[in-house]
Each structure stands twice: as structure tokens, then as C-alpha cells.
Amino acid sequence: MKVKITGTGSCLPKLRVTNDDLGQIMETSDEWIRSRTGIIARHIAVEETTTGMSTEAADKALKNAEISAEDVDIIIAATVSADKHLPGLACEVQKNIGAENAVAFDINAACSGFLFALDTAALYLEHGGYQHALVIGAETLSKMMDWTDRSTCVLFGDGAGAAVLSASKEDGILSMVQGSDGFRGDVLNCMARKVNNPYKKSDKALSYVSMNGQEVYRFAVKTVPKAVTDAVEQAGLHLEEIDLFLLHQANYRIIEAVSKRLGQPMEKFPTNLEECGNISAASVPILLDNVNNHGMMRKGMKIVLAGFGAGLTWGATVINW
């Protein structure tokens, strides 16, 4: 059985926070942030929740795919910032949209999460027995930030994106490449919650996201081009035949470096990090929905989706739109 993406949706919080806004609460400036990252603004959840944004993105994706919640057989949500430790985000969305026939579970692969979830859903559908999958990437990273650390908090935003995968007679998912390197995981991490156990003393304080930016950059510019190249080759294509490269929106410099190493023009690399920042697992599906809504994709186009981030993890998928 073949699999195609048949619908997309996304949701961003109402509050738009510019670099100048951040300059009012910390030692930073628009010039400092923009020159290093390409980010101009990001959206921060105030009243919104990971679950609420995921539900809205899911509803939009189902509408775009022209199916009902009852048609969904499986829901996979990728997140590192669910509202609850349990039940999982996918189960919360299942309840909210009324997908009573679906099996639902979460995946945590940080910024690569949506790619891992997408590929997992595709394998379920290819195996048979399932017709439609709802895949979600969603984050409220603002609650995980140290808002006194300008090297990290200025990079991230909140939001949710979703895609519907459907069993098809046409080629849709052409190839999938994934990888992990736990040996270098400390370059981007966030420690677990404090231990609450009367039999074990804990000296851990609350933890926030910490990152070695230079190491993450080196990892990304080396690993992503190889993953993309491998995925394109597995699909039986050449890089020149790819119409669009939708990369995780971490940093404009990283995207430029990947473009250069692949020998492909930046015109093939649409971005939204200028207005969204880095939204981890939500980054790729939100960009996919933006590109879809702006009419940039036509039937038969070959598109690469690629994610990379904490773990370290990475993934690349080639799709036939």
C-alpha cells in the first residue's frame, strides 16, 4: 500500500513577540538576534496550550483532507512540551476531535519528532489495515526557557502543525532516512523534573533548555546534507529534481549552509523562521502548511522534508505531492 499526504493544518498563538519586545526585558537587540539567526519575531502561548493548538491544527488538516475525525485510524503526536505527563498529547487530541476509532500515542524526538512520527505513521499505513493517519508536531517551548539566557530563549517559539496521511494507489512517501547519536546528546538538553520521592534526596533545581550553539551548528551542517542526499538517492532521484526543501527552521545560517553544501539555490528553501522562530517538532509541519496554503506546491512536485535536533536526532523524507 502506498501513502500520500492529503491534508495540512497549523496553529500559532495570538501573541507575536518581536526582537525589539525581547530587548525590553533582557540584554539583547533586534540586530543581535537577526544577524545571528534570521529571526524577527516568534509567537508565545499565553492562553493557548499544546493540546489546544494541536486540536486546532488537527481540525484544519482533517478539513483540508476532506475526511472526518471518525475516519482517522491512528494519531501520532510529536512533542517535548505536552501539557501533561499523562495522558499523552495524542490521546488528548483524540478526545477533543472525537476520533473514537483511532489508536493514539506520542513520540519524543525533539526537532526531528514530526519526521519520526510521519515515517512511523506511513509504515502503519503501508502495512495495511489502516486508511488514514493524523500526524501532529506541537510545542509550547516558552515554558521550558530560561528567560534570562538570551542565547537560547530568543530562538524558540510556540505552535502546532498537523498532516493527514492516507493510503493511496499513487506514490506519496518515496523514501525515509533517520538517524540518532546519543553520544553527543549533551549539546542540547533539558534535564528531567525534580525528584519527588520521600526515599530519595534530590538536589536538582528546575531545569531549562541549554544548548551549545556551535556544536549544534556543526552537527546540522554536516548531518543534514548527507541525510537529504541519502533520502533523495533512495527515492531514485537527483537533487536537481527536487522542487522544494522544507527544513527544520532552526537558524537561517544553517539553512544557507545546507543549501550551499547541496548545491541547490536558496529559492528552493522556503522559510518561516523570520516570524516563527524555532518551534522544534512543530517547525516542519507548520512550514509545510504555510507552503501548501500559499499555493507553492503542485501535484507531482518532489519535496524533501528534513528535521534535526536534540538527541541528537535527524530525519529526511522525500514526498511526491
Which residues does each PLM region occupy?
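Conserved beta-ketoacyl condensing-enzyme motif
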Residues: 5-7, 47-108, 115, 231, ...
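Conserved small-residue
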Residues: 5-7, 33, 61, 75, ...
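A contiguous, well-structured pocket-lining segment that forms one wall/lid of small-molecule binding clefts
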Residues: 203-273
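Conserved catalytic cysteine-centered active-site region
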Residues: 32-36, 40-52, 79-133, 260-288
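Condensing-enzyme catalytic core mediating Claisen C-C bond formation in acyl metabolism
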Residues: 1-47, 149-218, 222, 226
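Active-site-adjacent elements of ketosynthase-type condensing enzymes
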Residues: 22-24, 82-92, 132-153, 179-199, ...
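Conserved beta-strand-centric core segments of catalytic alpha/beta enzyme folds
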Residues: 1-20, 118-184, 288-321
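Beta-strand segments within the central parallel beta-sheet cores of soluble alpha/beta enzyme folds
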Residues: 5, 33, 70-78, 105-108, ...
